[in-house]
């Protein structure tokens, strides 16, 4: 395997990568049963035409994936990273006056990040800001949880979230922090204009400095019996 390539697993993650012309795919490993099922479900698409395909048994795929990793569903692909656009380039070149971008403060669990990516695509969020040092960019768990969403969402890796938010505020973005002590119900906001939706880590929430520099603090209404939700459900 190339030094720059990595493995992604799972039906939706691999199929969406195959459909993405911007994604370079080195090889695909799959069982014969998985290929038959995929061809039946995608009869109008010849998804394997331009890639090297290697048929493997389920046990061989288990070994390739790693026993402690996520279920592969009979399908694994060796891929390269997508070419990235920097956040600065995206903001400066985008003429849309209505943008919603999620920013994550020290959220590190790959399953949670993958679920956030999947939800962001479903709700037509325009991008995701993550801290480069703690972002598991090549995680099989992240790709599996995202169910192909990585292929459809701009992910901006930055060195410092606080500095990034200050820059975005100079570009007319409003920063809205989601916090248990928020004073406003997020469902009552129209979310027009340019917005940054800031979420904190699973264990510690949003850093105080980021909260102090936010324009708004929103809460998610819940039963009084439960104090907090996992980040992936927010």
Cite the ranges covered by each PLM segment.
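Short, acidic/turn-prone active-site loops that include or flank metal/cofactor-
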Residues: 33, 58-60, 133-135, 202-204, ...
């Amino acid at each position: 395997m190339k030094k720059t390539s990595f493995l992604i697993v799972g039906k939706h993650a691999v199929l969406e990568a195959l459909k993405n012309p911007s994604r370079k795919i080195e090889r695909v490993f799959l069982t014969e049963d998985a290929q038959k099922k995929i061809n039946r479900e995608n009869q109008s698409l010849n998804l394997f035409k331009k890639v090297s395909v290697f048929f493997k048994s389920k046990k061989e795929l288990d070994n390739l994936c790693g026993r402690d990793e996520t279920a592969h569903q009979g399908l694994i692909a060796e891929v390269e990273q997508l070419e990235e656009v920097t956040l600065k380039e995206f903001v400066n070149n985008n003429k849309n006056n209505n943008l919603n971008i999620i920013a994550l403060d020290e959220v590190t669990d790959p399953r949670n990040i993958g679920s956030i990516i999947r939800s962001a695509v479903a709700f037509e969020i325009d991008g995701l800001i993550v801290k480069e040092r703690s972002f598991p960019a090549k995680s099989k768990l992240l790709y599996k949880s995202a169910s192909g969403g990585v292929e459809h969402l701009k992910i901006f890796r930055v060195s410092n979230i606080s500095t990034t938010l200050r820059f975005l505020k100079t570009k007319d973005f409003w920063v809205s922090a989601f916090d248990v002590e928020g004073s406003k119900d997020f469902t009552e906001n129209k979310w027009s204009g340019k917005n940054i939706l800031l979420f904190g880590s699973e264990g510690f929430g949003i850093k105080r400095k980021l909260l102090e520099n936010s324009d708004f603090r929103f809460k998610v209404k819940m039963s009084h019996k439960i104090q907090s939700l996992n980040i992936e459900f927010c």
